[in-house]
Amino acid sequence: MKDNKVEPETIIHRHVADAREGREARVVTRVYSGWVLFGQQQFVKGYVLLLPDPVVPSLNALGQKERTQFLLDMSRIGDALIKVSGAIRINYAIFGNVEPALHVHVVPR
């Protein structure tokens, strides 16, 4: 039996809802698995976030097909950042400690 427990709304949920409505100013683009947003603070030029749509609590909450697409989108974002930023490599970070919803920090280095 599927657990129908409702996940708490997070800032990730709000950003995705705003992106869907065209109200999120930091949107870079829509990708198959979600949304790419500029990081609120550009501590490294080109820092972006990948937010899944629909929002899920963790990578492990995605089915195999959705998980594969999310990770492929993540790596394609990295490829694009290498091209436009001149970065040597890209750091990818999935934490979820502060906001308990899947999102990836994609940081050019």
What are these model-derived regions, one by one?
Residues M1-R109:
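HIT superfamily nucleotide-processing domains
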